[in-house]
Amino acid sequence: MAKDNSFDIVSEMNLEEVKNAIQIAEKEILNRYDFKGSKSEMSLDNGDLVLISDDDYKLEQLKDVLITKLIKRGVPTKNLDYQKVENALGGTVRQRVKLKSGIDKDDAKKINNAIKESKLKVKSQIQDDQIRVTGKSRDDLQAVMQLVRELELSVDAQFTNFR
């Protein structure tokens, strides 16, 4: 009897890599000419990124620097949820960026339906914020991986726990 193979579809953010990207971005901001004398800063607060700058233009520049550093560190930028820009103390502007982890119910249903419609001989189960896919053939599982990569999801999907 053939053994079933399986893997999990998850969406995670490596907080250590996010912290490293923030530190590298802060160093770049300290050395950039257009940020000299500015009150621009970024920090990690309760699992959220907080971006503070003098005005909207510098805030956008701050986001651009951060995004390039996150991409270089291999952190998925699809999992960043930008909140509304708000005024802060001292005439500065602040923007919170939520770090999304886990697959929400809508995306999980979308993945599940796509797998069922593909007619591959695999089973998929939604387990909280991840999806377990099992099947006898590794080729079918790889086809499911390719299918999930092609879907338009609100978060970045990763594949873990191969068995």
UniProtKB/Swiss-Prot annotation:
Kindly indicate whether the keyword Nucleotide-binding belongs to this entry.
Answer: yes
Q: Which residues form a coiled coil?
A: none
Q: Does the keyword Amino-acid biosynthesis apply?
A: no
Keyword vocabulary terms for this entry? Nucleotide-binding
Signal peptide residue numbers? none
What one GO molecular function would you report for this record?
nucleotide binding
Q: Which GO terms describe its cellular component?
A: cytosol
- Pfam families attached to this UniProt entry: DUF520 (PF04461)
- What's the stated role of this polypeptide? Nucleotide-binding protein.
Family the entry assigns: Belongs to the YajQ family.
Supply the HAMAP family for this chain: YajQ
PANTHER family in the cross-refs: UPF0234 PROTEIN YAJQ
NCBIfam families of this UniProt entry? Answer: PRK05412.1 (NF003819)
Name the UniProt record assigns to this protein: Nucleotide-binding protein EAT1b_2037
